[in-house]
């Protein structure tokens, strides 16, 4: 496993907007992803999560904003020049090639560094000379663009501008931002082109064979090298797609709902496998899904996307236990919500009963949403906070899901014990099971 410094930001999206015609699909996206993290973009269909992935991969252009890779804006860099590999939902494997042929495809273009003794001194001198010229040109062009952008921003401050003129100026500013990104990457692009031509060589057949053998062993495909893609199961196709992406040694692997077509058992196995591979190699994985359980199991961090905005970005446990609002809580898991009133420090009123809470950040008298997860509620036949009766009992395999009616409120509870319908029970919970948040009227 690589020694990864996780405090380092590898990808940063800054004030990113994306518009398709008159429709804005992403609105002020700000997202920092640390090197070596497994980050999931989670949201309902049409929320914008796949668009974010495509922007990072270079398959779509931003309307405005920055996509920084190791601190440099790369929004104008084409997909094939980004240090990423993408695994698509349909795998995008070549049906006419074998397992080996699919994996080998990217390696044919791979180049590796020449040994220092293989490079004449004159080449290094030429590189240093050209590098100075490229740096000077880069500085000059960036300075010109900064002056232009300052001028355009000043003009846009005028409140008297009509809509047509404002749009024209904004378009010029957006265009200059793309050109700025291009010149930010100018030195790197020129240097990489020079290095590719003079300081690297093509990978040999022997080296290709070794890399293919190593990656096939890593993803568990040994013995299947010569099989046709049409002969493989969904899980094996997924392993081929993963091997093809990993063998080119990208810094970031982008995964667009790659497990959605698999049946439940294979999908669960592939979830474990993906996480194991990611941790072993220390790569950055950015994963798109609409499956909440999948996101919670796989991720170091989750970005929940709603209507083109990031609703919450945090570690899975933080999002599950401390959602920022009612919508996030409902989306990430089963929920019981109550209207609550904050009485004073560490005291809240729920269903007419004053209870202790660990929360101390609200104002006395403030009306709040109160979340209590079904698995955090305990059932007792003798005593508790509230008395109710069981009106629904569903067996879920490892637990029972009960609906308990307390006066006019239905409360969902998960329990290992069976209770007959109409059974009178009491319910209670620990102090830290109460999660308070500011009220939000929107429903999922």
Swiss-Prot record:
Task: Give the matching InterPro entries.
Answer: AAA+_ATPase (IPR003593), ABC_SmlMolc_Importer (IPR050093), ABC_transporter-like_ATP-bd (IPR003439), ABC_transporter-like_CS (IPR017871), Mo/tungstate-bd_C_term_dom (IPR008995), P-loop_NTPase (IPR027417), Transp-assoc_OB_typ2 (IPR013611)
User: In which broad location class does this protein mainly occur, judging by the first location in its UniProt entry?
Assistant: membrane
Q: Where is the ABC transporter domain?
A: 11-332
Give the residues the record marks as binding ATP: 43-50
Give GO MF terms, alphabetically. ABC-type polyamine transporter activity; ATP binding; ATP hydrolysis activity
Its membrane topology, per UniProt? Answer: Peripheral membrane protein
Top-level taxon of origin: Bacteria
Ranges where the record places region Insert? 111-201
PROSITE patterns listed in its UniProt record = ABC_TRANSPORTER_1, ABC_TRANSPORTER_2, POTA
Q: What does this protein do?
A: Part of the ABC transporter complex PotABCD involved in spermidine/putrescine import. Responsible for energy coupling to the transport system.
> What's this protein's name?
Spermidine/putrescine import ATP-binding protein PotA
| Upper lineage | Bacteria, Bacillati, Mycoplasmatota, Mycoplasmoidales, Metamycoplasmataceae
């Amino acid at each position: 496993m690589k020694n990864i410094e996780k405090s380092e930001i590898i990808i940063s999206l800054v004030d990113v907007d994306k518009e398709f015609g008159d429709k804005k699909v992403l609105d002020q996206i700000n997202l920092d992803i640390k090197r070596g993290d497994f980050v999931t973009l989670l949201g309902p269909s049409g929320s914008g999560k796949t668009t974010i992935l495509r922007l990072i991969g270079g398959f779509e252009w931003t309307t405005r904003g920055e996509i920084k890779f190791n601190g440099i804006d790369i929004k104008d860099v084409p997909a094939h020049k980004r240090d990423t590999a993408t695994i698509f939902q349909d795998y995008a494997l070549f049906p006419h090639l074998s397992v080996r042929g699919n994996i080998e495809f990217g390696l044919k273009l791979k180049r590796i560094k020449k040994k220092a003794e293989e490079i004449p001194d004159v080449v290094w001198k030429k590189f240093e000379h050209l590098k100075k010229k490229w740096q000077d040109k880069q500085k000059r062009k960036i300075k010109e663009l900064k002056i232009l952008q300052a001028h355009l921003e000043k003009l846009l401050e005028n409140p008297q501008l009509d809509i047509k003129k404002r749009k024209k100026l904004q378009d010029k500013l957006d265009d200059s931002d793309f050109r700025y990104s291009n010149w930010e990457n100018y030195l790197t692009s020129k240097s990489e082109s020079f290095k590719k031509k003079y300081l690297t060589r093509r990978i040999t057949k022997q080296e290709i064979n070794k890399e293919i053998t190593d990656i096939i062993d890593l993803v568990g495909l040994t013995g299947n090298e010569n099989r046709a893609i049409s002969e493989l199961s969904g899980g094996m196709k997924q392993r081929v797609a993963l091997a093809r992406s990993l063998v080119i040694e990208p810094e970031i692997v982008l995964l667009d709902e790659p497990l959605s077509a698999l049946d439940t058992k294979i999908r669960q196995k592939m979830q474990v496998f993906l996480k194991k591979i990611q941790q072993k190699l220390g790569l950055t994985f950015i994963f798109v899904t609409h499956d909440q359980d999948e996101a919670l199991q796989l991720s170091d961090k989750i970005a929940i996307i709603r209507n083109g905005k990031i609703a919450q970005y945090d570690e899975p446990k933080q999002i599950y236990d401390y959602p920022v609002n009612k919508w996030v809580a409902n989306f990430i898991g089963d929920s019981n919500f109550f209207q609550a009133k904050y009485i004073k420090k560490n005291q809240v009123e729920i269903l007419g009963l004053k209870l202790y809470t660990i929360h101390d950040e609200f104002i006395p008298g403030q009306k709040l949403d109160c979340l209590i997860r079904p698995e955090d509620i305990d059932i007792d036949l003798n005593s508790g906070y509230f008395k109710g009766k069981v009106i629904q009992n569903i067996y879920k395999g490892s637990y029972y899901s009960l609906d308990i009616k307390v006066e006019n409120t239905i409360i969902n509870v998960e329990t290992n014990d069976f209770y007959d319908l109409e059974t009178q029970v009491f319910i209670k919970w620990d102090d830290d099971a109460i999660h308070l948040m500011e009220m939000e009227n929107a429903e999922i």
